[in-house]
């Protein structure tokens, strides 16, 4: 925004070993270098919005300190997370356990930088979250408004351009019929109002 630096999702981070990177075909591109291209340092990020806390979207939330513990990667940011997503990430089951790494989010709570929200909400002027369950129970998209222009960051509601057709839903979405309903809702609104899809 004009006054705040807001980052949506932090990627996988650099916690995984070589086997982890091979399994998920991860190409490590340090987020600090990507931010530097935009002229921003990690300490200048004011808000991080996590669409959800799976490791591929929240892995860069934290970094290892010199003592081997984890600290917030964006030390001056508040992290916006759906309250029920936080609960689900802490209370995993056999199906969801592999998607969450507690080192990606528990250190944020210890540092006092987590802001838990419920449902749709304006975060800052022109930046809102829209709860869009389907991929998991508490996924959220981010709506960006500037003047008469709007864009929506879809996260794993529509993870690739190939997933734009309504029936094309990832096989590992926990609630695929909810994904379908939320895709209809968001994509129809985007088409009606000429939103940019991100």
Q: Predicted segment positions?
A:
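Conserved beta-strand hairpin/beta-sheet module of binuclear metal-dependent hydrolase folds
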Residues: 1-33, 37, 141-156
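Active-site metal-binding loops of divalent metal-dependent hydrolases
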Residues: 10-13, 53, 84-85, 134-136, ...
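Feature marks short, surface-exposed loop/turn motifs that line or immediately flank catalytic pockets
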Residues: 14, 57, 87, 161
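Active-site gating loops and adjacent loop-to-helix segments of metal-dependent hydrolytic enzymes
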Residues: 18-19, 157-173
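Metallo-beta-lactamase
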Residues: 26-40, 44-56, 71-131, 136, ...
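Divalent-metal (often Zn2+) His-rich catalytic cores of metallo-beta-lactamase-fold enzymes
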Residues: 122-125, 143-145, 150-151, 161, ...
